From Swiss-Prot:
This is Probable GTP pyrophosphokinase. Residues 450-511 form the TGS domain. One of its GO terms (cellular component) is plasma membrane. Pfam families: ACT_4, HD_4, RelA_AH_RIS, RelA_SpoT, TGS. Pathway: Purine metabolism; ppGpp biosynthesis; ppGpp from GTP: step 1/2. It comes from Mycobacterium bovis (strain ATCC BAA-935 / AF2122/97).
């Protein structure tokens, strides 16, 4: 019935209502008419799309067209309006600025964005590149930028700005790199932008003064290019190295360019012969692959000449060969093909597919004895691996885009960042190294060094610097394993801890279960990994602090007992905390540690404690008396006490003058004071001339020292200033059992320290021995006795 109704409807004459809907309900009368209708609709859709694309192209600034063209190849669905907007903002903000070359400043961020587009970076990164100098060099605020372009762009620009604000230089370099690594952890695109920024600056470096060119080139060669290498950005790394080489060694660069150009014809012929043989054999083996030349870069050639001591004529591998396959299994098959053609060189095969270098780079490397007996380097990898090798971490965003298009994650994408063990290692170092200089030293070492791969007994791979030992291995596994390491077995055999490890060895370490187990100081002589060095240094620094803490407590106890003072009452938590705050130490433990390390004397701390308790005058006198070598009880001084007698007047009170501090052996004279006593002076005293004007008051005095006599002595110490100098001199005097009454130190502009000490001693004959002891202190070049007035 329904079918009849439909048929009737189809042939019935149209009503008024149906006529109004006729275009939508009309059924074609034949297949030909159906096809015509479909073609017409398709043409209308294409026309609309063409008009829309033409309109979009017409709104794109012509300056951006090269950037857009490159970016669209990888990101066909990219939102170009935000790129246009970012360019307009950057152009407006930099409108009044020029580069050193005289070009408008906007050419720089545009060039950086183009470099990043060629690397395959995402739209957000290109937007940040266009804006990366606006916050630093214009009045555009980070808040305004974030509000207009989003939080992600804001984070990237902020990261690049913070790196730019600290110059890579001798003082700040370590801290700058530390900030750079921290920024990488937050978002590695910050460093990718920075590397691209440096690449364009290196390309235009000729417009800067020569000294600035050299400084930037050294920074690039030592830090930026190796970092680009570790991030897998090989193409950028090579260009940075060659540009730096041309600036730092222009004549050597030009000579190598000339030598390479001179070998070009024979090199091209040789390469064509090699490629033909490989292609024919691969085809016969039914392996689908592309074979291409791989030119050596000038800096690489120079390094071989310098590091390996070769002449240019001995460097045969000016051109290597790269084989690009579709599948990993084809890579290993291609190695077999190459080895069947030419004899492989022993020890020159590297499998970076199974063990990726730096967690990013994958390839098979082999060197064979090629045609004419010349060494030939061959790299074999998949096309995906090649993209990663060329662009490194930047390729991660290509994979992200691939996922966005088809919903399937590329096998490399999930692990691209997470597998960068080297980056995680850097983050560990930057947290552990308290000193930025120490961190930079570790970083530079690791950037320059080659690596080996060893295995745990469970088959886990541990990457170590070449020359590493079982101790380096232990610290790479875990800090506590390193601290407690007492032995090792390599490939099932016991070995010494300083034995160097080789590629592919299985390493097992034995650890101590003793609670006080720790590293040996001897390990510092043979470990090579930055992690092991840092951990061992930290362990001994902590141990020294603990020893200094106990030493400081013992020194305080001895000083208090020497003064006959109540230890528990004097050295209590509250009073010690007050003194620690007064002396600007964090807590009581820090104060004890400072005492143990000699930064502050126990006697000084005791004096501060006494002052806190309000009894400083009386207690200090008692402390000074009991700390002298004399064992006799204190009593009022008589003529015998000062060691001077007055002929014919045995009961007269005598006193040693403080202006010249005479001691037995000095030529002396007496001066009758208005109180009836006698003041004893050296005859060469600075006051002697004025005293002798009153000749009637000058009398004869003689030395008559007794075992209880105590004399004041002043000495001057001249030394080259250094850390803990005063502490070492004071300790030398204390070892001679003298009681220091006063000390003063001045340091001149040429770092010469002049110290003056006044102390009591019982036997002046001992003075020569004391002066020799002070002369033996490191840095002291003169010490002699002086008068107080001198």
């Amino acid at each position: 019935m329904a079918e009849d109704q439909l048929t009737a409807q189809a042939v019935a004459p149209p009503t008024e209502a149906s006529a109004a809907l006729e275009p939508a309900l009309e059924t074609p009368e034949s297949p030909v008419e159906t096809l015509k209708t479909s073609i017409s609709a398709s043409r209308r859709v294409r026309a609309r799309l063409a008009r829309r694309m033409t309109a979009q192209r017409s709104t794109t600034n012509p300056v951006l067209e090269p950037l857009v063209a490159v970016h669209r190849e990888i990101y066909p669905k990219a939102d170009l309006s935000i790129l246009q907007r970012a360019y307009e903002v950057a152009d407006q903000r930099h409108a009044s600025q020029l580069r050193q070359s005289g070009d408008p400043y906007i050419t720089h961020p545009l060039a950086v964005a183009n470099i990043l587009a060629e690397l395959g970076m995402d739209t957000t990164t290109l937007v940040a590149a266009l804006l990366h100098d606006t916050v630093e060099d214009t009045g555009y605020t980070l808040e305004a930028l974030t509000e207009e372009f989003g939080e992600e762009v804001g984070h990237l620009v902020d990261g690049v700005t913070k790196l730019d604000r600290v110059v890579l230089g001798s003082a700040a370099e370590g801290e700058t790199i530390r900030k750079m690594i921290t920024a990488m952890a937050r978002d590695p695109r910050v460093l990718v932008i920075k590397v691209a920024d440096r690449l364009h600056n290196m390309r235009t470096m000729r417009f800067l003064p020569p000294e600035k060119q050299a400084r930037k080139a050294r920074e690039t060669l030592e830090v930026i290019a190796p970092l680009a290498h570790r991030l897998g950005m090989a193409s950028v790394k090579w260009e940075l190295e060659d540009l730096s080489f041309a600036i730092l060694h222009p004549k050597k660069y030009e000579e190598i360019v000339r030598l390479v150009a001179g070998r070009a014809p024979s090199r091209d012929t040789y390469l064509a012969k090699v490629r033909a043989e490989i292609v024919n054999t691969l085809t016969a083996s039914k392996i689908k692959a592309t074979v291409e030349g791989r030119p050596k870069h000038y800096w690489s050639i120079y390094q071989k000449m310098i590091v390996k001591g070769r002449d240019f004529d001995d460097i045969h591998d000016l051109v290597g060969v790269r084989i690009l396959c579709d599948e990993i299994r084809d890579c290993y098959a291609a190695v077999g093909v190459v080895h069947s053609l030419w004899q492989p060189m022993a020890g020159r095969f590297k499998d970076y597919i199974a063990q990726p270098r730096y967690g990013v780079y994958q390839s098979l490397h082999t060197t064979v004895v090629g045609p004419e007996g010349k060494p030939l380097e061959v790299q074999i990898r998949t096309r995906d691996m090649h993209r990663t090798a060329e662009y490194g971490i930047a390729a991660h965003w290509r994979y992200k885009e691939a996922k966005g298009r088809n919903g399937v994650l590329h096998p490399h994408a999930a692990a691209e960042i997470d597998d960068m063990a080297w980056m995680r290692q850097l983050l560990d170092w930057q947290r552990e190294a308290a000193d930025p200089g120490e961190f930079l030293e570790s970083l530079r070492y690791d950037l320059a060094v080659q690596e080996i791969f060893v295995f745990t007994p469970k088959g886990d791979v541990i990457t170590l610097p070449t020359g590493s030992t079982p101790v380096d291995f232990a610290y790479a596994v875990h800090t506590e394993v390193g601290h407690r390491c007492i032995g090792a077995r390599v490939n099932g055999r016991l070995v010494a801890l300083e034995r160097k490890l080789e590629n592919g060895e299985v390493v097992e370490v034995f650890t101590s279960k003793a609670p006080n187990a720790g590293p040996s100081r001897d390990w510092q002589q043979f470990v090579v990994s930055p992690r092991a060095k840092t951990k061992i240094r930290q362990w001994f620094a902590k141990e020294r602090r603990e020893e200094a803490l106990e030493t400081g407590k013992d020194a305080m106890a001895r000083e208090v007992r020497r003064g006959g003072l109540p230890l528990q009452r004097l050295v209590n938590g509250e009073s010690m905390a007050a003194v620690a705050r007064e002396l600007h130490y964090a807590d009581v433990s820090a104060l004890y540690t400072a005492i143990g390390e000699g930064h502050v004397s126990a006697k000084h701390v005791v004096q501060r404690l006494l002052a806190e308790l309000g009894g400083i005058d009386q207690a200090e006198e008692e402390l000074a008396e009991r700390s002298t070598p004399a064992t006799m009880p204190r009593r009022p001084r008589s003529t015998d006490d000062v060691g001077v007698s007055v002929p014919g007047a045995p009961g007269v009170l005598t006193k040693l003058a403080k202006c010249c501090t005479p001691v037995p052996g000095d030529v002396i004279m007496g001066f009758v004071t208005r109180g009836g006593g006698v003041s004893v002076h050296r005859t060469d005293c600075t006051n002697a001339a004025s005293l002798q004007q009153q000749a009637e008051r000058i009398i004869e005095v003689l030395w008559a020292p007794s075992p209880s006599s105590v004399f004041l002595v002043a000495i001057q110490v001249e030394a080259l200033d250094r850390h803990r100098l005063l502490s070492d001199v004071t300790r030398a005097l204390a070892d001679e059992k003298v009681n220091i009454l006063s000390a003063s130190v001045t340091t001149s502009g040429d770092r010469v320290a002049i110290s003056r000490f006044t102390f009591e001693m019982g036997d002046p004959k001992h003075l020569g021995h004391l002066l020799n002891a002070v002369r033996n202190v490191e840095g002291v070049y003169d010490v002699y006795r002086v008068t107080s007035a001198a």
